[in-house]
Amino acid sequence: MTTVADILKYVETLAPTYMKMDWDNVGLLCGSRETPVTKVLVALDPFERVCREAAEWGAELIVTHHPMIFDPLKSVTEETTVGRSIMTLCRHGISAVNAHTNLDCAPGGVNDVLAATLGLKDVETIPPFFRDDQGRQWGLLRRGRVEEQPLSQFLETVKSSLNAEGLRYVDGGKPVRVVAVGGGHCSDELMSALDAGCDTFVTADIKYNEFWDAQALGMNLIDAGHFATENPVVAVLAEKIAAAFPGIQVKISETHRDCMKFY
């Protein structure tokens, strides 16, 4: 019999908890470790629609990238989306597990999958590196190479590969050869990408001043969207869980889509 604890332990082999940022919240955030599991729903976010989908499908567990609980909670009521999500899970005996920044950093995680989806070659982790008191070292960003091409061509690749609704970008005035990637909000690592010899950086949630900084520094900076840059890992995560636990059903959420549209 497979339990929540079994799947949690496996997820933590894929994305060790020591790789999470200090401010993050990962692991089992709702439910019971002892609950038997026959169905797992995998999604990027544990939003209300995903929780309802899990309940309707009869899942005992949802596994997501983003955490069910991130900001401190003072109450759990139906007056908030987080409260409704938690209450839906509790009513139906569904547990919630997530791997967030630990999955961003982990080998084969968010940023390795993003690099592979964009067709980058010779992919490697670049600084900044993190190290714990046991001497273990890891990093967040990835760097890879593409055949030299104009920015316009690479933009087409990014948009089509990630099924992005649209892209925001600045042209740094250079062809694309060496690309850094950071799924989700990694734009504060612009200088890290530049110092690593990258001419192009693909990330999300880029601020106004960061676009100006990139242009001044001669960096092609591409905002492909938070959902689009991180969602590719969902299919990979679901596939790995299904392979590790062949006796259970694993499904990718059919209701969770990017809510952002471009007019």
Question: Which residues fall in each region the model found?
Answer:
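Hydrophobic structural segments
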Residues: M1-Y263
